[in-house]
């Protein structure tokens, strides 16, 4: 009887632990209700293709695969953990035909038609920049562009060396490998690069783009992996890392900002107002007022970084409003990131492109170029007054990934979402710098 009683108690304890297990903060029975609802919707192919249907699908799917990615050994340390697991599984669901067309449409409407990605990035930029000491922000922005240039130089040198080892000429390495990888992603990088290539050389833009996007896809994977590795290095060698802070304050001495008082929901709502209005102003500037400078188009997120920085420097925002914007930014980055990554996997990740690009030479060359970007940005950042880990992530890896969605993948892999403003400078302003370099390189080939 004693043994039976103990066995019964053990079974009850096991059942109790299972019922208390939480997925995305929800007890297992409650999550099971949400999952069963989603499966019914999938079985009957009945899902509204609007924000409600899209968010329901993205929340439920992101929750389960986020928990798996967070707990999976090796993957959670070296590959990027939950966010990377989510977008890879979501991309596979599209590739394998598991998602119905209605489900793809629902997610696409959230990401593309409603452009949730723009809102997500706008909120993170506003919160990240307004939370930084005003004087420190201005000094760091002035030093950041040279750090980006150091990353480009590092990527070019490493790329040329490894290219020569494979018997590839210098001009071809720069044209087909270094520039696409460091060019700011797909829409702001590979696409305009192919147009510049066509207009300068007269050759096929399609031929250039197909090669460029394949190389960029491989580099983006390495950027995510290296981000996770850099996070581990920073934890072991703490003097190399600012734990999410880019600037070494010993190098940029400033007075502390005034402390915020009590923060209410209203200040958080004001953070949303500032995020959307600053984005709107940046969009107007980029599309109508100053669509290009010296023939180079500047992306609206690059303008937004400058606008929010100017707003911070102006002193118009009280400490409470700044804290409200930071609270909103934290909510998006901590509670909605898994949701967003489902959309990234469905809308911005093509597994077939990744598979097609996996040749030995392409993999090795792309990896070495990304390493060069990391080394160059780390050295340049250290000399200017930044932490090497953070400068190599933002000015190195966020130059070598695939733009806005790549920034989120890289920063989530190394747990540094608060660096999104610098990542956007890399993807947008840095990408513009690469387009200027491309115009020169391509013209030398004619």
UniProtKB/Swiss-Prot annotation:
Molecular function terms from GO: metal ion binding; organic anion transmembrane transporter activity; symporter activity
PANTHER family given in the database record: CITRATE-SODIUM SYMPORTER, NA(+)-MALATE SYMPORTER
Species: Salmonella dublin
Residues engaged in binding citrate: 186-187, 402, 404-405, 428
Span of the signal peptide: none
Quaternary organization: Homodimer.
Intrachain disulfide bonds: none
Cross-referenced Pfam families: 2HCT
Gene field: citS
Keywords: Cell inner membrane, Cell membrane, Citrate utilization, Ion transport, Membrane, Metal-binding, Sodium, Sodium transport, Symport, Transmembrane, Transmembrane helix, Transport
Residues that hold Na(+) according to the record: 181, 183, 399, 401
Similarity field: Belongs to the 2-hydroxycarboxylate transporter (2-HCT) (TC 2.A.24) family.
Catalytic activity: citrate(out) + 2 Na(+)(out) = citrate(in) + 2 Na(+)(in)
Membrane topology classification: Multi-pass membrane protein
Superkingdom assignment: Bacteria
Any coiled-coil regions, as ranges: none
InterPro entries: 2-OHcarbox_trans_Prot/Firm, 2-OHcarboxylate_transport
Oxidoreductase keyword on record: no
Name this protein carries in UniProt: Citrate/sodium symporter
Localization per Swiss-Prot or TrEMBL: Cell inner membrane
């Amino acid at each position: 009887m004693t043994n039976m009683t103990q066995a019964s108690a053990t079974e009850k304890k096991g059942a109790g632990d299972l019922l208390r297990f939480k997925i995305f903060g929800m007890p297992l029975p409650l999550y099971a209700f949400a999952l069963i609802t989603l499966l019914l919707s999938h079985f009957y192919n009945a899902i509204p293709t609007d924000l409600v249907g899209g968010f329901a699908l993205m929340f439920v799917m992101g929750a389960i695969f986020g928990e798996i990615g967070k707990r999976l050994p090796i993957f959670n340390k070296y590959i990027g953990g939950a966010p990377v697991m989510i977008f890879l599984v979501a991309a596979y669901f599209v590739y394998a035909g598991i998602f119905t067309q209605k489900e793809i449409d629902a997610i696409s409407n959230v990401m593309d038609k409603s452009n949730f990605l723009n809102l997500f990035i706008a909120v993170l930029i506003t919160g990240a920049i307004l939370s930084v000491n005003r004087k420190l922000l201005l000094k760091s922005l002035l030093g950041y562009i040279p750090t980006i240039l150091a990353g480009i130089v590092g990527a070019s040198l490493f790329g040329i060396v490894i290219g020569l080892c494979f018997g590839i000429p210098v001009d071809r390495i720069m044209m087909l490998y270094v520039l696409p990888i460091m060019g700011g992603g797909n829409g702001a990088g590979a696409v305009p690069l192919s147009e510049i290539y066509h207009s300068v050389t007269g050759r096929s833009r399609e031929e250039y783009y197909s090669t460029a996007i394949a190389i960029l896809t491989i580099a983006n994977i390495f950027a995510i992996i290296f981000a996770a590795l850099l996070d581990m290095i920073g934890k072991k060698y703490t003097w190399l890392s600012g734990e999410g802070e880019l600037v070494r304050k010993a190098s940029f001495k400033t007075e502390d900002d005034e402390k915020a008082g009590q923060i209410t929901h209203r200040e958080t709502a004001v953070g949303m107002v500032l995020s959307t209005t600053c984005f709107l102003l940046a969009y107007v500037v980029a599309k109508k007022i100053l669509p290009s400078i010296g023939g180079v188009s500047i992306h609206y997120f690059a303008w937004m970084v400058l606008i929010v920085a100017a707003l911070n420097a102006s002193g118009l925002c009280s400490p409470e409003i700044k804290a409200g914007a930071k609270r909103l930014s934290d909510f998006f980055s901590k509670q909605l990131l898994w949701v967003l990554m489902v959309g990234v996997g469905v809308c911005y990740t093509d597994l077939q492109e990744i598979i097609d690009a996996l040749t030995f030479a392409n993999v090795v060359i792309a990896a070495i170029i990304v390493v060069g970007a990391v080394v160059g940005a780390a050295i340049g950042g250290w000399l200017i007054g930044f932490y090497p880990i953070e400068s190599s992530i933002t000015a190195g890896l966020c130059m070598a990934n695939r733009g806005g969605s790549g920034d989120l993948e890289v920063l989530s892999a190394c747990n540094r979402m608060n660096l999104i403003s610098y990542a956007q400078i890399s993807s947008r302003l840095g990408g513009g710098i690469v387009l200027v370099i491309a115009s020169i390189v391509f013209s030398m080939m004619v």
